[in-house]
Amino acid sequence: MVGFKNRYMLMEVFLDPDKDLLGEGTPIILTQFNLSKAIKDSILVNFGECGLGSSLGSFQVKYVNPITKLCIVRSSREEHRQVWLAITLVKSIGNCPVILNLLDISGCIRACRDTALKCDKEKFEQCSKSLSEEEIRQMNTSLEKIKLLEN
């Protein structure tokens, strides 16, 4: 039996620093659903229905941390460049302008998970003093979720 060959992309979401938030805090809560929708919309706009159909076979947003804004996206090996390009061309999630930065690309979930865990811990150490108790609880939940991440 032959397994599917996938690529896992670790990326970071930057909210647009030029947009004035007027004290609203974070304008959007990053979820698997809204990130997946933004990437699928980008694939549809840039590659058409055929490109979207070929990419959807194994496309999945595997992990999203709403505090550190790190995400893991899975795609097939054959279509990962197309998904990568579509990720690069995403300009907004909802009505919030964003920039998506690819940090790592890997052939197995374990290597990507380890890199994401390292990045999450470093970011958490940097911002832990300014987080509320609820955000710290949410961060710890995300760290536990990524440790359990497998196929």
UniProtKB/Swiss-Prot annotation:
It is found in: Nucleus, Nucleolus. GO terms for cellular component: nucleolus; plant-type vacuole; ribonuclease P complex. One of its GO terms (biological process) is tRNA 5'-leader removal. Keywords: Nucleus, tRNA processing. Disruption phenotype: Defective embryo arrested at the globular stage. Pfam families: RNase_P_Rpp14 (PF01900). Essential protein required during embryogenesis. Component of ribonuclease P, a protein complex that generates mature tRNA molecules by cleaving their 5'-ends. Also a component of RNase MRP. Component of nuclear RNase P and RNase MRP ribonucleoproteins. Interacts with GAF1/RPP30. Gene3D superfamilies: Ribonuclease P, Pop5 subunit. It comes from Arabidopsis thaliana. One of its GO terms (molecular function) is ribonuclease P RNA binding. The keyword Flavoprotein does not apply. Belongs to the eukaryotic/archaeal RNase P protein component 2 family. This is Probable ribonuclease P/MRP protein subunit POP5. SUPFAM superfamilies: Rnp2-like. The keyword Nucleotide-binding does not apply.
